Amino acid sequence: MNSQNIRIRLKAFDHRILDASTREIVSTAKRTGANVRGPIPLPTRIEKFTVNRGPHIDKKSREQFEMRTHKRLLDIVDPTPQTVDALMKLDLSAGVDVEIKL
């Protein structure tokens, strides 16, 4: 039989929501009889923004903000049709971006 993998990539700003969603996906996949590799933590993307504190003067006075994007990778090896159905019906948190590649 041809081995097929499902690769799931998750992104979120809050790592706690991301880890909870990852646990949900792993438990659903294992419950339906699939083999799961991961979660593999990928590098966190950090974007920094520097802005002036004052509206028109004091170039030396600045403030920095940062936005962190956390990422995880899951591989589901040899998924059953029940696994695919269960993953499609799974309701994850609103702050998690999910990319699925077959």
UniProtKB/Swiss-Prot annotation:
Residues forming coiled coils: none
Keywords: Ribonucleoprotein, Ribosomal protein
GO molecular function (one): tRNA binding
SUPFAM superfamilies, per database record: Ribosomal protein S10
UniProt key word Ribonucleoprotein: yes
GO biological process terms held by the UniProt record: translation
PROSITE patterns, per database record: RIBOSOMAL_S10
Disulfide partners: none
InterPro entries per record: Ribosomal_uS10, Ribosomal_uS10_CS, Ribosomal_uS10_dom, Ribosomal_uS10_dom_sf
GO terms for cellular component: ribonucleoprotein complex; ribosome
Signal peptide from the UniProt entry: none
UniProt-listed Gene3D superfamilies: Ribosomal protein S10 domain (3.30.70.600)
PANTHER family: 30S RIBOSOMAL PROTEIN S10 FAMILY MEMBER
Protein family (similarity comment): Belongs to the universal ribosomal protein uS10 family.
Quaternary data: Part of the 30S ribosomal subunit.
Job of this protein: Involved in the binding of tRNA to the ribosomes.
Protein's UniProt name: Small ribosomal subunit protein uS10
Organism the protein comes from: Bartonella quintana (strain Toulouse)
Gene: rpsJ
